[in-house]
Amino acid sequence: QLFDTVDPLISIDMSEYMEKYAVSRLIGSPPGYVGYDEAGQLTEKVRRHPYSVVLFDEIEKAHPDVMNILLQILDEGKINDAQGRTVDFSNTVICMTSNAGSSDRTALTGFGRTEEQVSREKSMKALQEFLRPEFLGRVDEVITFRPLEQADLEKIAALMLDEYKPGLEARGLKLEYTPQALAAIVNETSTRFGARELRKTIRKTLEDPVAEAIVAGRLTGGQTVTLAADADGKPQLVLPE
């Protein structure tokens, strides 16, 4: 909503920076080291696109030296890359994601405490185990996400289905789906670990049958593919005869 497009998003997967030797790739290798002529993967992107959203995914996997770099960025709003150029982060929005505490959210809430309160307390406790106090103190807000509900998952399923529309429209085909189909897809999927499993159900229900029908010549331009739900509440693909 900030930029109305995903283009300004700079996503950094912290699983690629678990080792000490990989940390220098963020701001570039120092003089005399391999890769000195190459720009830092973080600093160069921000230098070229100063108005960006920077996402550090799964921050708990990063090497401690990465935290030192981030601490300087959060504290001063800028950092020097390996070429000696000052990169300004004052116009960026920095987000960090973490799975801290996600494996220990099944305890009883107790009297007078909601599930969200308990979840936030466990998440904060887990964050404090790998983030230093001075780092946490420079974070503006810590947001704890609640488990996805039925309505949330149906909206996500709709977005996933919409991704198929441009490809089908390029072949002259139209995709339609009903609200009952969205509910059926969610009910057919095990969403205990989030919404990623929805894509498997959609692939099995929509993508594979439509691809087979196109290859077999049963679908031609001007036809409509409809995803609905049968009498048992299962997702059902209706192909034109």
Task: List PLM regions with ranges.
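AAA+ P-loop NTPase nucleotide-binding core of proteostasis motors
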Residues: Q1-E241
